[in-house]
Amino acid sequence: MSMSPTVIILACLGFFLDQSVWAHVGGQDKPFCSAWPSAVVPQGGHVTLRCHYRRGFNIFTLYKKDGVPVPELYNRIFWNSFLISPVTPAHAGTYRCRGFHPHSPTEWSAPSNPLVIMVTGLYEKPSLTARPGPTVRAGENVTLSCSSQSSFDIYHLSREGEAHELRLPAVPSINGTFQADFPLGPATHGETYRCFGSFHGSPYEWSDPSDPLPVSVTGNPSSSWPSPTEPSFKTGIARHLHAVIRYSVAIILFTILPFFLLHRWCSKKKDAAVMNQEPAGHRTVNREDSDEQDPQEVTYAQLDHCIFTQRKITGPSQRSKRPSTDTSVCIELPNAEPRALSPAHEHHSQALMGSSRETTALSQTQLASSNVPAAGI
């Protein structure tokens, strides 16, 4: 059993919307949570947490999933944004927000994406160096080393202007420090880097940043940033942009699909009208063909007439001298095919057959009278 293209398109569209577009719990979309100016905040600084929701919810509640609880978040609602100032180590952790409508207090959105806030400045800063040096040729491999006398468990490398960071475990070195080597691969263009240290027990509480390390590249530059060995979190902006693209694709499909279905319906209706008119046309053509004279049929009728005429004028004396065997004359006409005679031709043929039967009966009567002996002679 084959499925029509319309059914297949509707099934694919429903699967796409169910799997890709709607990221929801309880039938509602997720809000989007972000931090401004950055999710990496120095101790004593400030950060604004923002929630965005496309379905009209403009009142939100914010809660912290891990780390030390934040009392000012309890039973608090806010409009679109929430300012944390001054930032303390207790504010480090993962946040989510949920939206609701004031006229429908029981209708809540699904939890937003996780937003991780890192608080820096809690420990002494590490040092950052480059091998083979801070100035390299284009295409030359570069390795950045972050080290400290403190026994950090993890080092975090960030590039200026980038939201994500690279993370590697710290290992003891021969000189008594704890360090991590970040291989960047072939150098492409100059950038400025910093690194931080942290411990397993408090992964969101970082040290002071290292001194900035500018790496300059000589030669033809190109843009590249190595894939993180262990990314700490994904940027929310990229996920939000991806969701917007999927929403746009869904809207375009919903716009095009009705026109496609209307076009198919009109095409089928037009084809049905053409099929209904076609048999009448064939009948007209056949009727016109039957009215035309067929030269082969006329020739056949004239040939039979000549044969019957020849038999009529044959005398009795001649027939008595010949064997009583009728001679049939058959002439094969080229490419002759049996065809139905028109009413006029059929009437003419019946007339000829009747005339032929009368001629044959008269000839037999004359022959019988000539063979009977005269009485009284």
UniProtKB/Swiss-Prot annotation:
Protein's name in the database: Killer cell immunoglobulin-like receptor 2DL4
Subunit structure: Interacts with peptide-bound HLA-G-B2M heterotrimeric complex. Interacts with ARRB2.
Glycosylated sites: N141, N175
Signal peptide: 1-21
Function: Receptor for non-classical major histocompatibility class Ib HLA-G molecules. Recognizes HLA-G in complex with B2M/beta-2 microglobulin and a nonamer self-peptide (peptide-bound HLA-G-B2M). In decidual NK cells, binds peptide-bound HLA-G-B2M complex and triggers NK cell senescence-associated secretory phenotype as a molecular switch to promote vascular remodeling and fetal growth in early pregnancy. May play a role in balancing tolerance and antiviral-immunity at maternal-fetal interface by keeping in check the effector functions of NK, CD8+ T cells and B cells.
Lineage: Eukaryota, Metazoa, Chordata, Craniata, Vertebrata
Annotated segments matching region Disordered: 338-377
Membrane topology: Single-pass type I membrane protein
Cytoplasmic side, ranges: 264-377
Swiss-Prot/TrEMBL GO biological process terms: cellular defense response; immune response-regulating signaling pathway; negative regulation of natural killer cell mediated cytotoxicity; positive regulation of cellular senescence; positive regulation of natural killer cell cytokine production; signal transduction
Tissue: Expressed in decidual NK cells and innate lymphoid cell type I (ILC1). Expressed in a subset of peripheral NK cells.
Gene3D superfamilies listed in its UniProt record: Immunoglobulins (2.60.40.10)
Segments on the Extracellular face: 22-242
Gene that produces this protein: KIR2DL4
GO MF annotation list: MHC class Ib receptor activity; transmembrane signaling receptor activity
Keywords: Cell membrane, Disulfide bond, Endosome, Glycoprotein, Immunoglobulin domain, Membrane, Receptor, Repeat, Signal, Transmembrane, Transmembrane helix
Biased composition (Polar residues): 352-377
GO CC annotations, alphabetized: early endosome membrane; membrane; plasma membrane
Cellular compartment(s): Cell membrane; Early endosome membrane
One family name in Pfam for this protein: ig
Origin species: Homo sapiens
TM stretches of this protein: 243-263
Domain Ig-like C2-type stretches: 44-104, 139-202
Recorded family membership: Belongs to the immunoglobulin superfamily.
Cysteine disulfide partners in this protein: C51-C97, C146-C195
